[in-house]
């Protein structure tokens, strides 16, 4: 049984995991433990768009690299439980980004990110059928 004890950041993680499971009921979540002065965990979730999303919370995971069902994580977060569920490590699609060594290349203003999110939401509604949006739309470049 994997666990995630969160001391700060649960509402943001709950929102992210809720969105991920809303897009894909079989989404997975993976924990990457960090120790930057205080214990923290990056929680990554899969999406149906060939990308992952993440949120950092203060706290500790039972095991670095543990993978659980995102739906189990969401239920645990909503119930305020630390115990998340059984490990599902083989479900994770690949390697995680490195823990450090990133270089800031550019910053996107919040207004631009908000506008892109609104347009994305409109497109998601437009293609809300069982086929979803065309792959070419999902693979298009949005920011350069």
Regions found by a protein language model. Give the residues of each.
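Hydrophobic/aromatic-rich structural module bridging two neighboring secondary-structure elements via a short loop
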Residues: 43-87
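Long, compositionally biased intrinsically disordered terminal regions
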Residues: 73-144
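Generic structural signal for short, solvent-exposed loop/turn connectors between secondary structure elements
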Residues: 1-11, 61-66, 80-84, 144
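N-terminal ordered "arm"
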Residues: 1-58
């Amino acid at each position: 049984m994997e666990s995630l004890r969160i001391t700060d950041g649960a509402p943001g993680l709950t929102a992210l995991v809720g969105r991920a499971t809303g897009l894909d009921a079989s989404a997975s979540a993976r924990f990457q433990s960090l120790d930057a002065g205080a214990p923290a965990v990056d929680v990554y979730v899969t999406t149906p768009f060939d990308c992952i999303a993440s949120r950092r919370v203060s706290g500790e995971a039972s095991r670095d690299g543990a993978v659980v069902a995102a739906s189990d994580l969401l239920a645990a977060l909503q119930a305020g439980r630390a115990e998340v569920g059984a490990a599902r490590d083989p479900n994770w699609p690949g390697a995680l980004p490195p823990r450090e060594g990133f270089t800031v290349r550019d910053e996107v203003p919040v207004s631009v990110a908000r506008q892109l999110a609104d347009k994305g939401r409109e497109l998601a509604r437009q293609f809300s059928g069982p086929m979803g949006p065309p792959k070419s739309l999902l693979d298009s470049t949005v920011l350069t």
